[in-house]
């Protein structure tokens, strides 16, 4: 209790100091020079963007269990060592290996028309000859329930307009189970994204328990969904033929990649920077989450380059298997359970870097005040405002276990979710300056949190 009180008193004392001459908190004065150096170094060139391009151009899609991901992991280990990061190593986890296989969808009535589609991660296959059936278009789960008698033997298509990802993704993840409960033979979902470019969006789905039959599940573009809706509105019985070879192979070994800048005074206290290194198998995973990995990694690389060693350890973890299993984040929690309380803060970037970007924080009021004041150092980047809701899927497990404050860096959601889980998630969509800005803000924030005398209060 005495230690906790001491931390809180130190935090309160720091925050109550009089403002500096520049109108910024005086307690930050010792950190301004190094924070400015990190920001200037990060924004001096497009090194970070070039590294995202190297990763995604060279290794492409990186779905769990793939050779591409394994090669990318080996590259990351070698490159972290070349960067001078310390304690570079890998940590083993077993991950699912879902294989897409060949797939196709076509309208057979009215006259033949090929529909772009992507099977959803975790889906089963169709029979070898495919499934041909009439389609039932519904706009919600409630409508499906009301029209349950019509669903038996049909392919159910959820035409649910995008509102936000958290709401609309429920039909991608749970739509197959909803449709199967009413006797459907397959489920299709309108692409989960704000803008249609005739691009389907893949993503994980979940059958739940074994009380309901498993049926094939896929996503189709907004435009094709609307076309089928219009046809059915005219009383036309639209028939579709779906073929999918999707299946699970046995679980395989994968690796989380770890690199550090060891703390000068409190090496056992950890400021964690996380991201996921895997991606879906249809794009190159540039925004989801190649760029998130590189901008976090840059924080440590820049500290090493500038000979800045904070008091606490800065640990970068490139997590495996976020997209279709969360085995990387959960494995890290399990392997570091004893050290969970020693994690001072966990940071994640997994929502792109498209402008306008934002920083967000989740933690105690006392910690929030400190982080908000550190944010004043980011004024040159336009990121001084720290919003609520920081966190991430990969850092969540260790943060929940250790009651660890969380932060995140997020890009514009409309731009991000337009290409999310699509073949269009490529590095050319990203502006180099936006990558540099993200790296700069993360580096400066992490440096101060890792170097200030008191740990963030929990």
Regions found by a protein language model. Name each.
Residues 301, 305, 312, 417-458:
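His/Asp/Glu-rich mid-to-C-terminal helical/loop segments that flank catalytic regions of hydrolases
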Residues 50, 302-327, 346:
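Short helix-loop-beta-strand segments that form the rim/entrance of peptidase-like active sites
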């Amino acid at each position: 209790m005495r230690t906790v009180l001491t931390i809180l008193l130190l935090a309160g004392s720091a925050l109550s100091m009089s403002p500096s001459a520049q109108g910024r908190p005086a307690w930050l004065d010792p950190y301004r020079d190094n924070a400015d150096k990190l920001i200037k170094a990060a924004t001096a060139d497009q090194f970070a963007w070039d590294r995202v391009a190297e990763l995604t151009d060279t290794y492409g899609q990186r779905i769990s269990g793939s050779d591409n991901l394994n090669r990318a992991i080996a590259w990351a280990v070698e490159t972290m060592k070349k960067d001078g990061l310390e304690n570079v190593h890998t940590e083993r986890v077993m991950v699912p290996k879902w294989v897409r296989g060949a797939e196709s969808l076509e309208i057979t009535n009215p006259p033949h028309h090929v529909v772009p589609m992507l099977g959803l991660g975790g889906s089963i296959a169709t029979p070898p000859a495919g499934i041909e059936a009439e389609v039932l278009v519904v706009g919600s789960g409630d409508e499906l329930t009301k029209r349950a008698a019509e669903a038996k033997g049909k392919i159910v298509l959820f035409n649910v307009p995008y509102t936000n990802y958290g709401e609309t993704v429920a039909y991608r993840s749970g739509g197959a189970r909803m449709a199967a409960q009413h006797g459907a033979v397959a489920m299709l979902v309108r692409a989960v994204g704000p803008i249609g470019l005739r691009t389907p969006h893949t993503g994980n789905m979940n059958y739940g328990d074994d009380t309901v039959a498993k049926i094939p599940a896929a996503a189709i573009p907004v435009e094709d969904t609307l076309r089928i809706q219009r046809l059915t509105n005219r009383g036309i019985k639209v028939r579709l033929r779906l073929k999918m070879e999707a299946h699970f192979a046995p679980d395989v070994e994968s690796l989380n990649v770890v690199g550090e800048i060891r703390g000068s005074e409190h090496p056992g206290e950890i400021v964690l920077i996380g991201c996921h290194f895997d991606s879906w198998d249809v794009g190159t995973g540039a925004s989801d989450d190649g760029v998130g990995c590189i901008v976090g990694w840059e924080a440590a690389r820049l500290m090493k380059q500038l000979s800045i060693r904070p008091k606490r350890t800065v640990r970068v973890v490139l997590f495996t298997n976020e997209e279709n299993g969360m085995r990387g984040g959960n494995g890290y929690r399990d392997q570091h359970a004893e050290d969970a309380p020693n994690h001072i803060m966990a940071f994640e970037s997994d929502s792109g870097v498209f402008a306008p970007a934002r920083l967000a924080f989740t933690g105690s009021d006392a910690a929030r005040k400190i982080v908000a004041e550190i944010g004043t150092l980011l004024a040159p980047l336009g990121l001084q405002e720290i919003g609520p809701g920081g966190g991430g899927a990969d850092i969540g497990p260790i943060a929940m276990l250790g009651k660890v404050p969380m932060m995140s860096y997020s890009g514009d959601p409309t731009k991000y979710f337009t290409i999310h889980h699509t073949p269009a998630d490529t590095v050319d969509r990203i502006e180099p300056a936006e990558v540099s800005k993200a790296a700069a803000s993360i580096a400066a924030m992490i440096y101060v949190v890792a170097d200030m005398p008191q740990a963030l209060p929990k």
